Regions:
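Motif-centric detector for short Cys/His coordination patterns
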Residues: 1-85
């Protein structure tokens, strides 16, 4: 695995930018709520275990380029811990 093949290039109040070898992609917190309110280090710790597949081990999130580029095709949303009661 090439650790330089993917990196988080920016974190803002609106979302996270992910830089790959071929493109930069934006993940809004509205579409990717798992990243909101996470420690910066957990968001920065991203791996690419296989081409176009990204994994954040500290928050146990797996995403593909397709999911990031077309989040409406994958409507599964995170459930806040408070909703499990």
């Amino acid at each position: 695995m090439n650790i330089l093949s993917v990196e988080v290039s920016h974190i803002s109040s609106h979302g996270v930018w992910l830089l790959t070898q071929t493109e930069e992609m934006f993940m809004s917190y509205a579409d990717f709520p798992w990243f909101k309110n996470q420690p910066i280090q957990a968001i920065l710790n991203v791996e690419e275990p296989s081409p176009n597949h990204f994994y954040w081990p500290e928050i146990d999130v797996d995403l593909t380029v397709e999911m990031i580029n077309h989040p409406k095709h994958f409507p599964l949303q995170a459930i806040a811990a408070s909703e499990f009661h």
